[in-house]
Amino acid sequence: MSAPRGDHAILRARNLTKRVATLGPSTDVLRPDELIKFLDLVDGVRINLAHASPNEVKFRIEAVRSYEKAKNRPLAVIVDLKGPSIRVGSTSPINVQEGEVVKFKLSDKSDGTYIPVPNKAFFSAVEQNDVILMLDGRLRLKVTNTGSDWIEAVAESSGVITGGKAIVVEGKDYDISTPAEEDVEALKAISPIRDNIDYVAISLAKSCKDVDSVRSLLTELGFQSQVAVKIETKGAVNNLEELVQCSDYVVVARGDLGLHYGLDALPIVQRRIVHTSLKYGKPIAVATQLLDSMQSSPIPTRAEINDVFTTASMGVDSLWLTNETASGKYPLAAVSWLSRILMNVEYQIPQSPLLQNSRDRFAKGLVELAQDLGANILVFSMSGTLARRIAKFRPRGVVYVGTPNVRVARSLSIVWALEPLYIPAENYEEGLEKLISLKGTTPFVATYGIRGGVHSVKVKL
């Protein structure tokens, strides 16, 4: 396996843009030593509930927490909801050829002579001349005729359709409530391990009403997870500022966005989402097809390297690998290459214009002071609020964050530049002194946040 040379621990220490890798069948079969190297090179992991049983989720999270305990290094765990998508019902493979007339029917299953779709919302949404996209956009079908429970379309490309494949209508959102019933059941099934889940990612959210519904469900089930909102439809982009403000983390889901917008428009949409998130100081990730060729190749293409470099240079908090690590042949090489590329990007990211208030100004002042002194920033925080505020201003050095709350430590691990440390302490003064004793060997600017409007800052030159 061809992978970048170098000490992966050094790579991890220098990465300010965080790395998230999706766990799946490919990571399940890594040898113990390979899994350790793999997790050394990421800051968080993602598990897609659309492709993982409750037992698989439990197995993967246990492996991460075992590593975390052995290394004393917190990692964020993200579970990704399937969302209210429309998918093909049960069917034998259907080989569609370009120019062929294809029929969709309202049905749970098919003998392979038509495409079964067990959801009326699909047939309500589709109109004549619409374009139906399947297989990540590789299969395009132009709608020629519709009925209340059937649709005819002409294939504009070829492909093989199997059960469970997603169906997208170009430029349209389905009128389906969020969370979907499947998501409710999935969250109930994994609720026994809810304390190990740091973020729940919402798919196909269109408004803050959708986000609030998921938050209410999480509260009802006893989850304390933060909510990441995936921006992946035109409806979400149209409500972008609203969605960004009601989320804890924003994700540019490029795969689905590419189905709703022309591929030539995708870079513009991506930049808009990133800039809006930075404006409101919300952590922002970009996901999907970053190193896609590494599903079958031990090295990325030059175009992929340039894409990762350019995307990171926009100032994102994290980059998420999906199929590259979940089902690809070279998961360890993929995270190694991601780290290697990011090493050349960090210090070229400009400061981002952000909304200002007094607490923002305090955080910005800390960042500027540390930068002028060539110092690290040390923060002791109970909730992580000040640490996140500091990260908004994109410090150029590592920010060590001590916290007595392991959940806070885990959630901060995928925020720009933050290096969380679990430090038990009864109060802020004790916690900051413990942090300084661990990480205060070089010039530093240290603080423990805001209590009643009073700031305490220590500087070592």
Curated annotation (Swiss-Prot):
Enzyme class name: transferase
Gene3D superfamilies listed in its UniProt record: Phosphoenolpyruvate-binding domains, PK beta-barrel domain-like, Pyruvate kinase, C-terminal domain
Its EC number(s): 2.7.1.40
List of residues binding K(+): 48, 80
Keywords: ATP-binding, Glycolysis, Kinase, Magnesium, Metal-binding, Nucleotide-binding, Potassium, Pyruvate, Transferase
Positions bearing the site annotation: Transition state stabilizer: 230
Binding-site residues for substrate, renumbered to this chain: 46, 255-256, 288
Coiled coil: none
Residues annotated to bind Mg(2+): 232, 256
Activity's dependence on pH: Optimum pH is 6.0.
Thermal properties: Optimum temperature is higher than 98 degrees Celsius. Thermostable for 2 hours up to 100 degrees Celsius.
Leader sequence residues: none
Binding site for ATP: 48-51, 87, 165
Superkingdom, natural source: Archaea
Claim: tRNA processing is one of the keywords in the record: no
Family statement drawn from the similarity comment of this UniProt entry: Belongs to the pyruvate kinase family.
Name listed for the protein in its UniProt record: Pyruvate kinase
Natural source organism: Pyrobaculum aerophilum (strain ATCC 51768 / DSM 7523 / JCM 9630 / CIP 104966 / NBRC 100827 / IM2)
